[in-house]
Amino acid sequence: MTYIENIFLCMVSPLLVAALCMGRRQLRFFLFCIAGMGACLLSAYINTFLAAVCQADALAATAEIAPVVEEMMKLLPLVFYLLVFEPEGEKIKAAAITIALSFATFENVCYLIQNGADRFSFIFFRGFGTGAMHVLCGLIVGGGLAYTWQRTWLKIAGTCGLLGAAITLHAIYHLLIAYGGAAQYVAYALPVLLVAAGKLSAFRLGQRK
């Protein structure tokens, strides 16, 4: 049995110490890291509870329950940040990526502790794939919210649409992994390629301007 709350405390403790040492300017980054890991911790409990209540099998829990719960949990601290502080567009994007990155980091650490780290090639691909998938979902939600929250009439509809897009991408990723074989490695490679393609497109657009 993996006591993920103990892992959470061990990972958050140095972040809290660093946050106190770095000052107010860097405090936001550490708080979003902690929020992302906390969202991952709560997602694990909620996923387990809903899977038990719905009597879902492993595939249903992975492809139907987990993407919805995890993306909603990642969105909550971001919405709180938007409602309370009303940040600028770039700060929204940075916050979403930080939450997604810390979520993926905590998830990978728990996976390693539970399943071991003896298969380097598999762990390597999974680490990059899972991290890129969560970051890609963060880019979709964060970049979209930076646009939609500047327009009052788009806030609710835009947020729901972005959440739906992130959930769909997340579910496709889990379905490919659940299928196994070559599809599993396609799932790991796809988010990395999409992030790289998006970054390249943004770079080219910046050069044209």
Which sequence ranges carry the predicted segments?
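Hydrophobic alpha-helical segments at protein termini of multi-pass membrane proteins
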Residues: 1-209
